[in-house]
């Protein structure tokens, strides 16, 4: 979460901005949202309800305000990998991974990716046993899961849909490896 906050914007703007404003801005960097998605955080809004990430500003009451972000206590190893034109540019593709650990065993894996569709998405079809596979099998399974979840029409001058899916796969494998090394 701290790394995501550091790369979301430069120090001057971080000192002025609020987390809720950053999360609701369409043009903001996706790293914070991805970090909160893999940590299964909720946004508490007054006077509305509890929202999961990513928050869709269109769903919010215009009179509501995010009053708190709740992150459940959990034992996780997290990692965030990204590709951008420069270190402070908005990510072209970004992948966040959380390995949930109970009694020294990986019990679940959470993956969230931005840059393969209009909004950041959580990849639901990956099983925690993937960490025990060879790298080539892991990459193949992740590629298929991302391909199934991606918006195949989502492309722009920064990358085609195919490029974004391939990069998301590479970044996700890197993030899993980095999370495993923290164990």
Tell me what each language-model feature is.
Residues 1-183:
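C-terminal structural segment of proteins
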């Amino acid at each position: 979460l701290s790394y995501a906050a550091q790369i979301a914007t430069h120090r001057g703007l971080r000192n002025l901005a609020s987390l809720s404003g950053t999360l609701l801005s369409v043009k903001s960097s996706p790293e914070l949202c991805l970090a909160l998605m893999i940590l299964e955080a909720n946004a508490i809004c007054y006077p509305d309800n509890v929202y999961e990430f990513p928050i869709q500003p269109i769903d919010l009451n215009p009179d509501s305000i995010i009053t708190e972000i709740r992150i459940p206590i959990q034992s996780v190893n997290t990692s965030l990998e990204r590709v951008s034109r420069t270190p402070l540019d908005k990510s072209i593709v970004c992948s966040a991974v959380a390995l949930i650990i109970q009694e020294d065993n990986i019990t679940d894996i959470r993956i969230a990716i931005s840059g393969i569709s209009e909004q950041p998405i959580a990849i639901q079809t990956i099983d925690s046993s993937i960490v025990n596979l060879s790298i080539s099998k892991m990459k193949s399974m992740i590629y298929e899961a991302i391909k199934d979840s991606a918006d195949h029409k989502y492309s722009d001058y920064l990358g085609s849909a195919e490029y974004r899916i391939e990069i998301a796969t590479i970044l996700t494998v890197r993030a899993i490896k980095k999370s495993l090394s923290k164990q």
